[in-house]
């Protein structure tokens, strides 16, 4: 092959690579821009801030904070029949998915902190039933996980989950949300090179790859087994699983911080986009990701309360007084201070 042909082939290869990269970028951006109203920043005016009366004083939401709700989505066939029956009674639009885990990220840019509040999926709260056009057609009291079940499993289900969490947290407004199917756990886990955890639960009925009392480097589907398993471990409560998810999240965060900042967020968005739904644009997600990595991360324990077995499924009832105090401490400030 002569030199001219080699140069021509080289130019063609370069052009092809650039075109492929551009197509990938357009795919990611296009995926988010097709959503109804992607946003780039919180848009909460002072007049719209919720007020909360607690212990003889008025509080208002701290608008200097930015909040992001993340929900991991999975299918729950055992609860599907009951959900379908209720959906039929309400003439609601429902899907086959529920929230497997939920956590609220609270970013304080002034203090350079990111506080993570896990929420128990079994928490009993007010849930909106949605019609075919995404409109509210009624409400009922049910597990927080069910908020995602009402809607198309797309952006309408995401907003419905945001509303349910907001109602649970005494009207606190939530700026953004991301819902991600649980299949993405293995993808993200391997993107950071795996995550090492100390296995404290007995997984012997599930796998011999998670020996109790030993450190294990999680890769692939083993990471999903670690964060999702509940019924076949010794302690089958969701509270126990949430403690395990907290351990994993803290280890994952350290791995994320070790990734090259210039390229990793774009790569992660590209790999995870088939699993994600969000109200944010791709640019906003990248910005949020960097803000989280630049912050000091604190993962709280989930709100305290009581887990009881309902007629068919577990129900969690938070301690109202402790939850009110927690919400005030995390999200609200005295009304006088906000006016000053």
What is each PLM-predicted segment?
Residues 2, 11-13, 23-340:
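Non-catalytic, solvent-exposed segments at the cell envelope interface
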